[in-house]
Amino acid sequence: MKFIIKLFPEITIKSQSVRLRFIKILTGNIRNVLKHYDETLAVVRHWDNIEVRAKDENQRLAIRDALTRIPGIHHILEVEDVPFTDMHDIFEKALAQYREQLEGKTFCVRVKRRGKHEFSSIEVERYVGGGLNQHIESARVKLTNPDVTVHLEVEDDRLLLIKGRYEGIGGFPIGTQEDVLSLISGGFDSGVSSYMLMRRGCRVHYCFFNLGGAAHEIGVRQVAHYLWNRFGSSHRVRFVAINFEPVVGEILEKVDDGQMGVVLKRMMVRAASKVAERYGVQALVTGEALGQVSSQTLTNLRLIDNVSDTLILRPLISYDKEHIINLARQIGTEDFARTMPEYCGVISKSPTVKAIKAKIEAEEENFDFSILDKVVEEANNVDIREIAQQTQQEVVEVETVSGFGPNDVILDIRSVDEQDDKPLKVEGVDVVSLPFYKLSTKFGDLDQSKTWLLWCERGVMSRLQALYLREQGFENVKVYRP
């Protein structure tokens, strides 16, 4: 099988040296992502495209899907590469490829040509289009908005029959810009802002401030791992978790009610800046949107920024909530965000929307900054690739089974779309569907006399959810890995 990778247009307008660097980085990223599917595949870069050739036909759909999620790719073409002798030979090969698709449809032919030939692209379009129109009685030519566009590419003595075109996510290849640290909470905003910086070519590390126990951290780990695995797995990134409960306790005890929200955000920026400096990261990323909550007014945002010299990027600053939720739905983080455990330990009864710098600084004089230094020093830093392994260690008390007993039921916790695409059927045992984002509210409604074997494709989500359910007191939970 063969895929032609078309570059994001902004890459093609760069200077020659920058363009070559971007293409080289994108080629490496593609290799890093696809080696998990087929170690023998070949990735070859050219000036205006990248070729991917693989032998394992069983991995075709997986490879195609992975390519559409790699930043820097505008679209991909799935092609059949064949030799040709003349223009009539091109027509015959196009007829064999497209006959069934064109029956009863309107169509047009579009040709791109590279190399020296005795014919032009327009001449090929007319010849092939006329031939298809004559040989397929139910088809007719329509040059504007046809049902089917027959895409052909002629390169020297090779004909590329384009079997399908699939849109990528665009943007710049990860690694072409510098690293950033995303302050991730697991909600709609931080997930979308992290994705937007990945799409713009940044390697995104994650910093999580734990305000409320293990359940919240488990949920945020799921989001971070999902984002990395789906859009950024070409690079290693860090997941840094900071236990912020001591800081929250100090704020509740020492800070005036109306100033708590701004002070908490300033403490988070201070802590994140220390982490960024430790690992040589150039900027922080937050999901703040102007006016969304009391701490996100211009006055308050300026005061929050003042505590650090580190650049703070806010890609969602002008977005409304509906737009953010729509983006979360597109990238697949909406279900995580809707069911994310929330912690409301620092909510002022009357938060200020226009904090005064002198007053904020006076409140912070009462704060014991050694507490902040201590929690940063004790921060848990893991390679995001190890989250699955670490989760496996943490849920060692949750048994992993490959078979099943008479009282066991397999619980498929994949999303509804994944279940529809690839239904799970296991002979000799019942399979019940309950998407992971409904477990926290619906698992208790299931028959608790049964033993539930949680299953997902890779096993990461099932282990995380098993740990969560165990913490909620459910002992009838195991992880199913056939």
UniProtKB/Swiss-Prot annotation:
Pathway stated in the Swiss-Prot or TrEMBL entry: Cofactor biosynthesis; thiamine diphosphate biosynthesis
SMART domains: THUMP
GO cellular component assignments: cytosol
A Pfam family matched in the record: ThiI_fer
Gene Ontology MF terms in the entry: ATP binding; CCA tRNA nucleotidyltransferase activity; tRNA binding; tRNA-uracil-4 sulfurtransferase activity
Domain Rhodanese per the UniProt entry, residue ranges: 404-482
InterPro entries in UniProt: Rhodanese-like_dom, Rhodanese-like_dom_sf, Rossmann-like_a/b/a_fold, ThiI_AANH, ThiI_fer, ThiI_N, THII_Thiazole_biosynth_dom, THUMP_dom
Localization of this protein: Cytoplasm
Covalent S-S links between cysteines: C344-C456
Active site: C456 (cysteine persulfide intermediate)
Binding residues annotated for ATP, in chain numbering: L183, I184, K265, G287, Q296
Alphabetically ordered keywords of this record: ATP-binding, Cytoplasm, Disulfide bond, Nucleotide-binding, Redox-active center, RNA-binding, Thiamine biosynthesis, Transferase, tRNA-binding
This enzyme's EC code(s): 2.8.1.4
UniProt catalytic activity: [ThiI sulfur-carrier protein]-S-sulfanyl-L-cysteine + a uridine in tRNA + 2 reduced [2Fe-2S]-[ferredoxin] + ATP + H(+) = [ThiI sulfur-carrier protein]-L-cysteine + a 4-thiouridine in tRNA + 2 oxidized [2Fe-2S]-[ferredoxin] + AMP + diphosphate; [ThiS sulfur-carrier protein]-C-terminal Gly-Gly-AMP + S-sulfanyl-L-cysteinyl-[cysteine desulfurase] + AH2 = [ThiS sulfur-carrier protein]-C-terminal-Gly-aminoethanethioate + L-cysteinyl-[cysteine desulfurase] + A + AMP + 2 H(+)
GO biological process, one term: tRNA 4-thiouridine biosynthesis
Residues covered by the THUMP domain: 61-165
Database matches in NCBIfam families: ThiI_C_thiazole (TIGR04271), tRNA uracil 4-sulfurtransferase ThiI (TIGR00342)
Family: Belongs to the ThiI family.
Protein role: Catalyzes the ATP-dependent transfer of a sulfur to tRNA to produce 4-thiouridine in position 8 of tRNAs, which functions as a near-UV photosensor. Also catalyzes the transfer of sulfur to the sulfur carrier protein ThiS, forming ThiS-thiocarboxylate. This is a step in the synthesis of thiazole, in the thiamine biosynthesis pathway. The sulfur is donated as persulfide by IscS.
Full protein name: tRNA sulfurtransferase
Organism: Salmonella dublin (strain CT_02021853)
